[in-house]
Amino acid sequence: MPSPVEQRVSSKIRRTVRNGEAIYEKEYVLNDWDNDAAVIYHRAQQEIELLRQLAVSNRFGGRLGVVSVAAADPEAATIATHEIAGMSLGQFVLEDENVATNLTPWFLAGRWLRQFQSLRLPNDMTETVSKRDPTDIVDYCGLRLDSLLEFGYSWPHSRLKTALLKKIECLRDHCDDTSKVWVHADYAPGNLMWDGRTLTPIDFAMVRSGQPLEDATYLIHRIEMHLVYRPWLRLPVAAIRRAILRGLGLPTADQSAAYQMLMLKHQICRLHTYVRRPASSFKQALHDRWVRTVLRRRLLQAVKNTLK
Protein backbone atom coordinates (compact mmCIF):
# COMPACT_ATOMS: atom_id res chain seq x y z
CA MET A 1 0.00 0.00 0.00
CA PRO A 2 1.44 3.45 -0.90
CA SER A 3 2.68 5.59 1.98
CA PRO A 4 0.98 8.95 2.75
CA VAL A 5 3.77 10.77 0.92
CA GLU A 6 3.49 8.52 -2.15
CA GLN A 7 -0.27 9.12 -2.36
CA ARG A 8 0.12 12.89 -2.65
CA VAL A 9 0.43 14.53 -6.04
CA SER A 10 1.53 18.01 -4.93
CA SER A 11 2.70 19.93 -1.89
CA LYS A 12 0.03 21.63 0.15
CA ILE A 13 0.06 24.42 2.70
CA ARG A 14 -3.41 25.20 3.97
CA ARG A 15 -4.73 27.54 6.63
CA THR A 16 -7.21 26.14 9.12
CA VAL A 17 -8.59 27.19 12.50
CA ARG A 18 -8.28 24.98 15.57
CA ASN A 19 -9.67 25.97 18.94
CA GLY A 20 -9.95 29.54 17.72
CA GLU A 21 -6.30 29.70 16.54
CA ALA A 22 -5.10 29.96 12.94
CA ILE A 23 -2.88 27.04 11.94
CA TYR A 24 -0.85 26.41 8.78
CA GLU A 25 -0.59 22.74 7.79
CA LYS A 26 2.18 21.61 5.43
CA GLU A 27 2.42 18.26 3.66
CA TYR A 28 5.68 17.00 2.19
CA VAL A 29 5.44 15.25 -1.18
CA LEU A 30 7.65 13.32 -3.59
CA ASN A 31 9.39 15.42 -6.27
CA ASP A 32 9.86 18.28 -3.80
CA TRP A 33 13.50 17.18 -3.80
CA ASP A 34 13.73 13.45 -4.62
CA ASN A 35 11.60 10.51 -5.70
CA ASP A 36 12.72 8.69 -2.57
CA ALA A 37 10.11 8.58 0.20
CA ALA A 38 12.81 7.86 2.78
CA VAL A 39 14.50 11.18 1.95
CA ILE A 40 11.20 13.04 2.36
CA TYR A 41 10.44 11.46 5.73
CA HIS A 42 13.96 12.24 6.91
CA ARG A 43 13.68 15.88 5.87
CA ALA A 44 10.29 16.25 7.54
CA GLN A 45 11.72 14.82 10.76
CA GLN A 46 14.71 17.13 10.44
CA GLU A 47 12.50 20.21 10.10
CA ILE A 48 10.37 19.17 13.08
CA GLU A 49 13.45 18.70 15.26
CA LEU A 50 14.88 22.05 14.18
CA LEU A 51 11.66 23.93 14.97
CA ARG A 52 11.58 22.36 18.41
CA GLN A 53 15.22 23.29 18.94
CA LEU A 54 14.50 26.89 17.98
CA ALA A 55 11.55 27.01 20.38
CA VAL A 56 13.69 26.16 23.43
CA SER A 57 16.83 28.07 22.43
CA ASN A 58 17.74 31.10 24.52
CA ARG A 59 19.26 32.74 21.43
CA PHE A 60 15.85 33.91 20.27
CA GLY A 61 13.02 35.90 21.79
CA GLY A 62 12.16 39.58 21.98
CA ARG A 63 12.54 40.96 18.48
CA LEU A 64 13.83 37.67 17.06
CA GLY A 65 10.81 35.42 16.66
CA VAL A 66 10.51 31.67 16.09
CA VAL A 67 7.78 29.53 14.56
CA SER A 68 5.66 27.60 17.06
CA VAL A 69 4.75 23.99 16.22
CA ALA A 70 1.07 23.19 16.76
CA ALA A 71 1.27 19.55 15.66
CA ALA A 72 3.69 17.31 13.80
CA ASP A 73 3.55 13.79 12.39
CA PRO A 74 6.90 12.69 10.95
CA GLU A 75 5.43 9.34 9.85
CA ALA A 76 2.99 11.21 7.61
CA ALA A 77 5.53 13.96 6.77
CA THR A 78 3.20 16.74 7.94
CA ILE A 79 3.84 19.80 10.11
CA ALA A 80 1.34 22.33 11.49
CA THR A 81 2.53 25.68 12.85
CA HIS A 82 0.78 28.59 14.50
CA GLU A 83 0.12 31.64 12.33
CA ILE A 84 2.62 34.48 12.62
CA ALA A 85 1.20 37.98 13.00
CA GLY A 86 2.05 40.80 10.61
CA MET A 87 3.10 40.82 6.96
CA SER A 88 5.96 39.27 5.05
CA LEU A 89 8.89 41.46 4.06
CA GLY A 90 7.75 40.85 0.49
CA GLN A 91 4.52 42.67 1.34
CA PHE A 92 6.46 45.25 3.35
CA VAL A 93 8.51 46.13 0.26
CA LEU A 94 5.41 46.64 -1.87
CA GLU A 95 2.94 48.12 0.60
CA ASP A 96 4.58 49.87 3.54
CA GLU A 97 4.98 53.63 3.17
CA ASN A 98 8.07 53.55 5.41
CA VAL A 99 9.99 50.98 3.36
CA ALA A 100 12.44 53.64 2.12
CA THR A 101 13.45 54.68 5.65
CA ASN A 102 12.77 51.75 7.99
CA LEU A 103 15.83 49.48 7.99
CA THR A 104 14.99 47.73 11.26
CA PRO A 105 13.49 44.54 9.78
CA TRP A 106 16.51 44.08 7.53
CA PHE A 107 18.94 44.49 10.41
CA LEU A 108 16.90 41.98 12.41
CA ALA A 109 16.94 39.58 9.46
CA GLY A 110 20.74 39.62 9.63
CA ARG A 111 20.75 39.35 13.43
CA TRP A 112 18.36 36.38 13.29
CA LEU A 113 20.77 34.61 10.94
CA ARG A 114 23.65 35.30 13.30
CA GLN A 115 21.80 33.53 16.11
CA PHE A 116 20.64 30.73 13.83
CA GLN A 117 24.18 30.05 12.69
CA SER A 118 25.34 29.70 16.29
CA LEU A 119 23.19 26.57 16.75
CA ARG A 120 25.04 23.27 16.58
CA LEU A 121 24.73 21.35 13.33
CA PRO A 122 23.69 17.68 13.63
CA ASN A 123 26.24 15.15 12.42
CA ASP A 124 24.04 13.93 9.57
CA MET A 125 23.29 17.38 8.13
CA THR A 126 24.09 17.62 4.41
CA GLU A 127 24.96 20.55 2.13
CA THR A 128 22.31 19.77 -0.49
CA VAL A 129 18.55 19.43 -0.36
CA SER A 130 18.40 17.00 -3.28
CA LYS A 131 20.72 14.06 -3.83
CA ARG A 132 20.86 15.13 -7.47
CA ASP A 133 22.62 18.41 -6.69
CA PRO A 134 26.44 18.54 -6.47
CA THR A 135 27.95 19.95 -3.26
CA ASP A 136 30.72 21.79 -5.12
CA ILE A 137 29.54 25.24 -6.20
CA VAL A 138 31.38 25.10 -9.54
CA ASP A 139 29.72 21.80 -10.44
CA TYR A 140 26.37 23.12 -9.18
CA CYS A 141 26.54 26.24 -11.36
CA GLY A 142 27.80 24.21 -14.31
CA LEU A 143 24.79 21.92 -14.00
CA ARG A 144 22.43 24.91 -14.02
CA LEU A 145 24.13 26.47 -17.05
CA ASP A 146 24.02 23.17 -18.96
CA SER A 147 20.35 22.85 -18.10
CA LEU A 148 19.59 26.12 -19.91
CA LEU A 149 20.32 24.38 -23.22
CA GLU A 150 17.92 21.58 -22.31
CA PHE A 151 15.17 24.20 -22.19
CA GLY A 152 16.17 25.50 -25.63
CA TYR A 153 17.98 28.60 -24.33
CA SER A 154 21.20 29.04 -26.33
CA TRP A 155 23.14 31.00 -23.74
CA PRO A 156 25.89 31.15 -22.61
CA HIS A 157 28.20 30.11 -25.42
CA SER A 158 30.97 27.71 -24.44
CA ARG A 159 33.65 30.38 -23.98
CA LEU A 160 31.44 32.47 -21.71
CA LYS A 161 30.35 29.42 -19.73
CA THR A 162 33.99 28.48 -19.18
CA ALA A 163 34.80 32.02 -18.05
CA LEU A 164 31.89 32.09 -15.60
CA LEU A 165 32.85 28.77 -14.04
CA LYS A 166 36.52 29.80 -13.87
CA LYS A 167 35.51 33.01 -12.10
CA ILE A 168 33.42 31.07 -9.58
CA GLU A 169 36.25 28.58 -9.07
CA CYS A 170 38.75 31.38 -8.46
CA LEU A 171 36.46 33.06 -5.94
CA ARG A 172 35.83 29.73 -4.22
CA ASP A 173 39.56 29.14 -3.86
CA HIS A 174 39.96 32.58 -2.25
CA CYS A 175 37.19 32.20 0.34
CA ASP A 176 38.63 32.81 3.79
CA ASP A 177 35.82 31.24 5.83
CA THR A 178 35.19 27.58 5.00
CA SER A 179 33.10 26.83 8.09
CA LYS A 180 29.67 25.22 7.79
CA VAL A 181 26.58 26.56 9.54
CA TRP A 182 22.81 26.19 9.47
CA VAL A 183 21.35 27.55 6.21
CA HIS A 184 17.64 28.27 5.78
CA ALA A 185 18.13 27.99 1.98
CA ASP A 186 14.99 29.99 1.11
CA TYR A 187 15.63 33.15 3.13
CA ALA A 188 13.51 35.30 0.86
CA PRO A 189 11.37 38.33 1.78
CA GLY A 190 8.24 36.21 1.44
CA ASN A 191 9.47 33.87 4.18
CA LEU A 192 10.29 36.61 6.70
CA MET A 193 7.34 37.82 8.78
CA TRP A 194 7.34 41.32 10.27
CA ASP A 195 4.77 42.72 12.70
CA GLY A 196 6.44 46.09 13.24
CA ARG A 197 8.58 44.83 16.11
CA THR A 198 9.50 41.16 15.68
CA LEU A 199 11.12 39.41 12.71
CA THR A 200 10.16 35.73 12.33
CA PRO A 201 11.40 33.45 9.51
CA ILE A 202 9.06 30.68 8.34
CA ASP A 203 9.23 27.57 6.13
CA PHE A 204 12.35 25.58 7.00
CA ALA A 205 11.64 22.79 4.50
CA MET A 206 14.90 23.35 2.59
CA VAL A 207 17.19 23.78 5.60
CA ARG A 208 20.72 22.38 5.24
CA SER A 209 24.33 23.16 6.08
CA GLY A 210 26.31 25.69 4.10
CA GLN A 211 28.42 28.83 4.13
CA PRO A 212 27.81 31.71 6.59
CA LEU A 213 26.88 34.17 3.80
CA GLU A 214 24.47 31.97 1.86
CA ASP A 215 21.20 33.17 3.38
CA ALA A 216 22.23 36.82 3.65
CA THR A 217 23.39 37.00 0.03
CA TYR A 218 20.21 35.29 -1.13
CA LEU A 219 18.06 37.82 0.72
CA ILE A 220 20.09 40.71 -0.72
CA HIS A 221 19.86 39.19 -4.20
CA ARG A 222 16.08 38.97 -3.94
CA ILE A 223 15.90 42.61 -2.86
CA GLU A 224 18.14 43.65 -5.76
CA MET A 225 15.83 41.78 -8.13
CA HIS A 226 12.86 43.81 -6.88
CA LEU A 227 14.33 46.82 -8.68
CA VAL A 228 14.52 44.76 -11.87
CA TYR A 229 10.91 43.63 -11.54
CA ARG A 230 9.62 47.04 -10.40
CA PRO A 231 12.12 49.81 -11.21
CA TRP A 232 9.70 52.47 -9.95
CA LEU A 233 10.03 51.30 -6.33
CA ARG A 234 11.78 53.64 -3.88
CA LEU A 235 13.88 50.87 -2.43
CA PRO A 236 17.24 51.74 -0.80
CA VAL A 237 19.00 48.54 -1.83
CA ALA A 238 22.48 49.61 -0.70
CA ALA A 239 21.21 50.64 2.74
CA ILE A 240 19.25 47.39 3.07
CA ARG A 241 22.36 45.40 2.15
CA ARG A 242 24.41 47.20 4.79
CA ALA A 243 21.70 46.68 7.42
CA ILE A 244 21.52 42.93 6.76
CA LEU A 245 25.29 42.52 6.92
CA ARG A 246 25.55 44.64 10.08
CA GLY A 247 22.94 42.45 11.73
CA LEU A 248 24.89 39.39 10.69
CA GLY A 249 28.00 40.88 12.27
CA LEU A 250 29.86 41.02 8.94
CA PRO A 251 29.53 44.65 7.82
CA THR A 252 32.23 44.46 5.13
CA ALA A 253 31.35 41.00 3.82
CA ASP A 254 30.16 42.40 0.48
CA GLN A 255 33.83 42.95 -0.39
CA SER A 256 34.69 39.27 0.12
CA ALA A 257 35.27 36.51 -2.41
CA ALA A 258 32.52 34.42 -0.80
CA TYR A 259 29.96 37.21 -1.27
CA GLN A 260 30.83 37.68 -4.95
CA MET A 261 30.83 33.92 -5.57
CA LEU A 262 27.42 33.39 -3.98
CA MET A 263 25.92 36.35 -5.85
CA LEU A 264 27.01 34.78 -9.14
CA LYS A 265 25.38 31.52 -8.06
CA HIS A 266 22.12 33.30 -7.18
CA GLN A 267 22.08 35.11 -10.53
CA ILE A 268 22.65 31.87 -12.45
CA CYS A 269 19.85 30.18 -10.51
CA ARG A 270 17.52 33.15 -11.08
CA LEU A 271 18.25 33.01 -14.82
CA HIS A 272 17.53 29.28 -14.77
CA THR A 273 14.18 29.95 -13.09
CA TYR A 274 13.19 32.51 -15.71
CA VAL A 275 14.17 30.15 -18.53
CA ARG A 276 12.44 26.97 -17.32
CA ARG A 277 9.25 28.61 -16.04
CA PRO A 278 6.72 29.12 -18.88
CA ALA A 279 5.09 32.54 -19.18
CA SER A 280 1.35 32.65 -18.53
CA SER A 281 0.69 35.58 -20.89
CA PHE A 282 2.29 37.77 -23.55
CA LYS A 283 2.85 40.49 -20.97
CA GLN A 284 4.54 37.98 -18.67
CA ALA A 285 6.72 36.77 -21.54
CA LEU A 286 7.95 40.33 -22.17
CA HIS A 287 8.66 40.80 -18.47
CA ASP A 288 10.56 37.50 -18.27
CA ARG A 289 12.61 38.42 -21.33
CA TRP A 290 13.59 41.70 -19.66
CA VAL A 291 14.63 39.89 -16.47
CA ARG A 292 16.72 37.40 -18.43
CA THR A 293 18.41 40.26 -20.30
CA VAL A 294 19.36 42.02 -17.06
CA LEU A 295 20.74 38.82 -15.54
CA ARG A 296 22.77 38.05 -18.64
CA ARG A 297 24.27 41.54 -18.57
CA ARG A 298 25.24 41.17 -14.92
CA LEU A 299 26.84 37.78 -15.45
CA LEU A 300 28.70 39.05 -18.51
CA GLN A 301 29.89 42.08 -16.54
CA ALA A 302 31.40 39.76 -13.91
CA VAL A 303 33.75 38.14 -16.44
CA LYS A 304 34.14 40.81 -19.13
CA ASN A 305 37.85 41.31 -18.46
CA THR A 306 38.61 37.62 -19.04
CA LEU A 307 36.81 37.63 -22.40
CA LYS A 308 38.91 40.40 -23.97
Where are the model-predicted features located?
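Regulatory N- and C-terminal appendages and interdomain linkers associated
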Residues: M1-P4, Q284-K308
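A glycine-centered beta->alpha junction motif in the catalytic cores
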Residues: L30-N31, T81-V99, S118-L121, L145-E150, ...
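ATP-binding pocket architecture of kinase catalytic cores
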Residues: E21-M125
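Active-site acidic catalytic loop and adjacent metal/ATP-binding pocket
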Residues: S3-Y24, E169-E214
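Active-site catalytic-loop/activation-segment of kinase and kinase-like phosphoryl-transfer enzymes
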Residues: E127-D173
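C-terminal subregions of glycosyltransferases and related glycan-biosynthesis enzymes
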Residues: S11, D133-G152, A243-I244, L248-R277
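Phosphate/pyrophosphate-binding loops and the adjoining catalytic core of nucleotide-dependent enzymes
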Residues: M1-T16, A22-K26, D32, T81, ...
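Active-site activation/catalytic loop segments of kinase-like enzymes and analogous catalytic loops
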Residues: E214-P251, K265-Q284
